[in-house]
Amino acid sequence: NKFGKFDFPSVYLEVNLKNLKNLDLIRKRKFNHNDFDPEYVNASLKISDPKNPKEYKNIKVKLKPKGDREIHFMNLDSMSYKVDVRGKKNFVFGMEEMSIQKPIVRNYSWEILFHDLLKAEGIIGLDIVPIKFYRNGEYLGIFVIEESFSKELLEKQNRKEGPIITVNNNISHIFPNLNFKTYSERYWLSKKKDFFEKSNQNLENIKVNFEDKNFNLFDYFDTEKWARYFALIDLLKMYHGSSIKSVKLYYNPTTGLIEPIGYDGHFGSGYNDFAFIDLIHDPDFYCGWICTHDKNWLNLFFDPRNKDFIESYLLNLKRFTSKKYQKNIENHLNKKINNINNFFYSEYQGSDRVWFIGPLPYYFDENVIYERQKKLLKKIEFIENYFEKINQKNIAKKKQKILLINTFNSNEDIINQLANENIYLSKGYWILNNLKLIDKNIFLEEGSVVILQGENSFVGKNKVFKFSGPGMITQFNGEINLSNVKFSKIKNIKINGLNWSGAFNIINAKVIMNNVEIIDNSGEDAINIVGSKSNIDQLVVNNSFKDAVDIDFGELSFNKIICNTSGNDCLDTSGAFVSGGYLFGENIKDKLGSFGENSNIKIKEVSGKKVNFGVVSKDGSKSLIENLTLKNSKILAASYKKKHFFGNSNLKISKINSDENYQNAKDKILLSKPNSIIINNIEFKNFIKNKKILKKFYVGS
């Protein structure tokens, strides 16, 4: 492939002679003293990308040598860099923090495949971009840019900002005799101290109590994501990525649980006959250095008492070893990975021997994966018979407790009220399960927090079902069915360690709503729906303090949403798939429809009166509005970039009706390059600078 043409980007590093000499001195010192923490030097990058003709010139960066193996520091031309972009609105392929390294250091395309499959499974993975790398005009060969751990990583993958945690390798990386450290610790201590404290408290509790017979894995970890993570590691033999010193831990402030962030899987480090299955029937099964260093960490998950986790792990492993999943891998190899491999083959690349460069050239053999599937299938057959015997011991299934709440009321505390028309919930926490109520009035005392779990149904059959009073309601997992229900004067209440922004929150649940009204709420959102699958027939929000309806991730299908008087947006989406019939807003202080962060929007009719901004598609979102009707609107439509690590946005409006002639009113349509707006099948061409749009929308941006 030496003479093949490849459309991978070129990255040009410019560093002055003084700083280059400093880099080389630091590299040599790091080579001889691995515990040495090097300093940054200033430099700049320029990017030329055939897929994106716009050149990014002179992006200011700071960089230093990085790595924990000698292969990172062997010489100046092949050394690995840790790179941070200087400046708030500059990004390199959507990254603000990254590494630039030789492909062998990142396990060639095996690591890219690993992270792609993680992301396809809803697990946080890193972007890895192959590049042609130049330093001061000299071509140094093929390198890869790998994303680092930042809030941008989380937002791009539909997560709210939360602490990312790793192991302090300077002390120990053997669980539980280790110390954790948080990325950007100063930020968390100054901005969101409760998230920092709760995540660290949970990790310390795990270290102290993991051998206790009452220890509950489900209280601390998002076990479904961890089950998929370990099963995928089994498939690709990425066992290095299972080590506590490799995998990064994300504390999700929406769920209060820890999720994995894949890192450093490193295919090829042995383990042909091992799988995590072996630990289920034999906790002392020998599996080399992983079991030597991570025995307690792995047994934390693969203890047979963790019935739900093991069942989920086995189900995912069966899925990953199926013919259907093999076809998915083949398709991904053909679509992306094979081209990357051909790019790597275009220059001589020595095989990866972990600690050194092998004498043979690198070659990607996909048959290794398919042979691995066959081997795992045999192990699955054995363990299912073994696990069935274990299940006969009636090991109780465990449910997640919300660890942030120690004292609470339960169903037993309202059982005497259930026959009454009026139910009173006093100040404090109420964790209620599987309620099926009809024609009730539920009064929330000031400071009451109602957390619903399981399957809940509230129906106004002969009259309106009412929730009223200054308390907060949250459906946490499970399912909620609301029909003919009115929420009055509910409010958001802060719970330390959690990011629940609504007066009414729905998290990771199935939602059915018909004829629901929320009136006079207090808080950032009247209703915040996160990571859920929602079907709404009619939802009306009156007099919302800030956002009326906030959809973070997940799917929403609605017939009618109406907002009357909102202090901020009517419908605000982030990373959501939305299909709607009719959206109406009146007296909206900000945006009628705010669609951001890779949302995918299709709405038949959007209508508004006295709206500050009409519809906005930003930060990688794709939005289609069939009919837009606005009266007394400052801005009709806009497409721009608020968060520069997202891609381009587009907004298509099939038909627009307005008391303003948008074709002659350039200030009514706001568009920045390279985003797009199409109205009545005509592409809008009046571009203005993105920063000018931000000034109009966000004071002080």
Which residues fall in each region the model found?
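A conserved helix-loop-beta module that forms one wall/lid of the active-site cleft
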Residues: 103-138
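Active-site substrate-binding loop specific to GH73 endo-beta-N-acetylglucosaminidase modules
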Residues: 166-167, 171-175, 249, 258-265, ...
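Internal "kinase-insert"/substrate-recognition segments embedded within catalytic cores
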Residues: 121-126, 138-228
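Surface-exposed patches in mature extracellular/periplasmic domains of secreted proteins
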Residues: 123-134, 216-220, 247, 324, ...
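Conserved NTP-binding catalytic cores of kinases and kinase-like/nucleotidyltransferase enzymes
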Residues: 1-109, 113
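Middle-to-C-terminal accessory/interaction subdomains
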Residues: 21, 197, 201-238, 242, ...
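Extracellular beta-rich repeat passengers
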Residues: 401-701
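Structural recognition of the beta-strand scaffold that forms the well-ordered cores
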Residues: 82-84, 99-102, 132, 141-145, ...
